Amino acid sequence: MSGLPAPLVASNVSLSLGTQEVLQAVRVTLHAGQWLAIVGPNGAGKSSLLTVLAGLRAPSAGQVLLMGRKVAVWPAAQRAQQLAWLSQQGQAEGDIAAIDVVRLGRMAHHGWLSAPSAADEAAVFAAMQETECSAFAPRRLNQLSGGERQRVLLARVLASSARVLLLDEPSTHLDAPHQRAMLRSVRQRASAGVAVATVLHDINLALLADSILVMARGCVVAQGAPHDAALQAALVAVFDGAFSIERLTVAGQARWAAIPLFNSTAST
């Protein structure tokens, strides 16, 4: 085992917005090579947690450590080399070429006043190929569909080569083939030692992760592997029994799926 600290650790993090406490003593450890899915009903605090983990919002209590140092003390450029964040809203409007958006992912490596290196450009082109957005590289964001914009923004994050990826609803606007491609990118990064956390509303996508963090009302309710019975029970409970979790066999491998439950007495 390596003696290095976990890439990202949140200890007893709380967050208040006005009079509302949106996070309450949350503890999260994101390990290298791990894909963590964060799930919970609307208003559970998932996106708020991600902004605190990214150092974009200071917690009211507790602390977040990035590579063993408080995330808030990292110079912005150095932090961006270590940690990349995809926001839920996407910030995907504007008269800027798609390829220039992806190039922003390399800005922390070469600075505002320096031209990108050959390695920077190679990372940009590789990320755009991976997310299948090379074909519209010169087009403006405001000319792209929602799914195309999302792929550009995901490419920006992947181009950063950061050791920690925080992705808030990365599957938004993506059709099934591009959701699959996104999941493949996440899994490949985790397999290469990157620490990845994704906020997901689709429970079936979350069930593909290494570990699932279940939130409700600003608290962590449970965390565990998808096959863990206690984790599955917590998932069903926080979503008011809207689904059951069933074991499937796909291509000879065990998989878990959330199957919606409908009230059989409801009128048709």
Each model region followed by its residue ranges:
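Helix-to-loop junction immediately C-terminal to a conserved catalytic motif
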Residues: A54
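Conserved ABC ATPase "signature" region
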Residues: R103, A118-F136
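Conserved ABC transporter NBD signature motif
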Residues: G62-K70
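Conserved ABC ATPase signature
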Residues: R140-L144, E148
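The feature captures the beta-strand-to-loop junction immediately N-terminal to the Walker
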Residues: V39-P41
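ABC ATPase nucleotide-binding domains
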Residues: V238-T268
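Catalytic Walker B motif of ABC-type/P-loop ATPase nucleotide-binding domains
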Residues: L165-E169
